[in-house]
Amino acid sequence: VKLGIPHIFDVQLGYTFQRSHYDEPEVWSDNVEAVRRMFRTPDHYAYFTASANITRKFKASLFGNYTGEMLVQHNAGYIDADRSELTPSFWDLGLKLSYNFQLTNTIGLEINGGVKNFLDSYQDDIDRGAFRDSVYIFGPMMPRTFFLGLKFTL
């Protein structure tokens, strides 16, 4: 869905609901009961972007993704035995502010800055050490990250 008032405000959003299952239960470990639910496939996913032109030269944008709970495999090593884990749902939100300067009739400069993953959504049970499960990773890949940028336009 995309809504807005041209040159003032716009918002775009989407939502996906799905149930992903195998026809027959999948066995992935001798220690874990077979399941039909597909791993790493959340039932709920959503995204949005919203932008507002505060003034003719100043713009603010808010953007984000929502990922629902999902089942992931957690292999033994750091933990005592293989197990299936149900992850928490999480939001990954960002904010960007930008200001535009017209340097000449044909050259523009945008200065921007913001923060990605400002809620600092991050997996809090990452395995560590030599026996960690290197594929037991879910959620945003980056912690809270600040950024600055310049953009020239012709």
Residue ranges of model-derived segments:
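Surface-exposed coil/turn segments at beta-strand junctions on protein surfaces, enriched
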Residues: G4-P6, T41, N53, L86-P88, ...
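Residues that define the transmembrane beta-barrel architecture of outer-membrane proteins
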Residues: P42-A46, S89-L93, I107, M142-F146
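Small side chains
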Residues: G4, G14, A60, G64, ...
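Outer-membrane beta-barrel transmembrane domain signature
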Residues: E85-D92, L154
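Gram-negative outer-membrane beta-barrel transporters
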Residues: V1-N75
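Extracellular loop and loop/strand-boundary signature of outer-membrane beta-barrel proteins
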Residues: W28-R37, I79-E85, D133-F138
